[in-house]
Structures are given as structure tokens and as C-alpha cells.
A protein has these predicted regions:
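Nudix hydrolase/Nudix homology domain
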Residues: 101-161
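Conserved Nudix-box catalytic region and its N-terminal flanking loop in Nudix hydrolases
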Residues: 19-57, 152-161
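Conserved N-terminal beta-strand and adjoining loop/helix that marks the start
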Residues: 1-20
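A short coil-to-beta-strand element that immediately follows conserved catalytic motifs
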Residues: 62-70
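Short coil/loop residues immediately preceding or within conserved phosphate-binding loops
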Residues: 7-9, 31, 81
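Short loop/turn microsegments at loop-to-beta-strand junctions
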Residues: 9-10, 46, 103
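A structural signal for short, well-ordered beta-strand segments
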Residues: 12, 68, 86-88
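Active-site-adjacent beta-strand/loop module that shapes the phosphate/pyrophosphate-binding cleft
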Residues: 73-95, 106, 110-112, 119, ...
Length: 161
């Protein structure tokens, strides 16, 4: 394989009591709009590690990736842009938002999702899917058998061929 330039982002799908964690952007082009806790992957960082870091930076909570809920992919200005939404399991830790990035955070039910001013239709769809569906791709961590971070995400059910 050959490396290519890539814009790689991640989002956390965190559920509590049948509600999903949403954040309102405090600044930038999406100021005042709602979405999932999200951010960019740093060089040399696994996307699954980045989502845990971003969740802690933005909302002050820690968690564990349990699987992938969805992926958004597009090409803009000749640059591939990939965005991975991970299910993240957390305990009932209190939220402690980073007010420089996030103006508000709250848990919302499926019935409430339509009332938000979303960052994008894709973000809305990822949140809705994450709230209504379990992770279709489960995580297997092979890092302990390799000399580097190594995760595989596979379907939970056997897929007939």
C-alpha cells in the first residue's frame, strides 16, 4: 500500500439511559450547531485512540471503544475525507466540557434529535443510527500479539457468502 494525503476524523457515540451524548460547537464555522463529540486523528495515532482522547478533551469523560457505528467518506478539493463514528462505553461520569470548544453538552432521546441545528445531515444520521443500533462492527484488539497498535473491526454475525 502507498500512503495518500487524508483528512481523518472521529466521533464518539456515547449512550446513557437510551439517550445519546450531543455537543454544541462553541466556535468556528459550526458555532452554535450540534453534533457528536468529535475531532481529528493525530499523526501516529489510531483513530480508536483519537476518539477516546477527543471525548475526554471535550467532555471530561473516559471510555472504551466497543465498535464502529458508521463511516462517512467524501472527496473535497481532491482530498479524501474519512470520518469514523465509534460506539464508546463509559461509566456514569459527570460531564466537564471544554468551554473553549463546546458551549453545551447534553444527552438527547431519539424523539429530540429533530429539534437540533445539526452540523450536517451526515452527523444527524450517524447520531440517529448510533442511538437506535448497536455497533454493527465489533472491535478485536490484536495489539498484544503485534509490535504496534493493531485493531480489526468485523461483523458480529457470520455473513453468508
Amino acid at each position: 500500500m502507498r500512503p495518500i494525503p487524508l483528512d481523518l476524523g472521529v466521533a464518539a457515540i456515547v449512550l446513557r439511559d437510551s439517550k445519546i451524548l450531543l455537543v454544541q460547537e462553541a466556535q468556528g464555522p459550526h458555532e452554535g450547531q450540534w453534533g457528536l463529540p468529535k475531532g481529528y486523528v493525530n499523526p501516529g495515532e489510531l483513530p480508536a485512540s483519537a476518539v477516546i482522547r477527543e471525548l475526554h478533551e471535550e467532555c471530561g469523560i473516559k471510555g472504551t471503544v466497543t465498535g464502529i457505528c458508521g463511516v462517512r467518506e467524501c472527496v473535497r478539493n481532491e482530498l479524501a475525507r474519512i470520518f469514523i463514528a465509534y460506539h464508546v462505553q463509559t461509566s456514569n461520569q459527570p460531564l466537564a466540557i471544554d468551554v473553549d470548544e463546546i458551549s453545551e453538552a447534553r444527552f438527547a432521546s431519539a424523539d429530540e434529535l429533530e429539534q437540533f441545528n445539526w452540523i450536517s445531515p451526515a452527523m444527524h444520521d450517524l447520531a440517529k443510527s448510533g442511538l437506535l443500533n448497536d455497533s454493527p462492527l465489533a472491535k478485536i484488539d490484536y495489539s498484544t500479539t503485534q509490535s504496534y497498535p493493531y485493531l480489526v473491526h468485523i461483523a458480529k454475525e457470520e455473513i453468508p457468502i
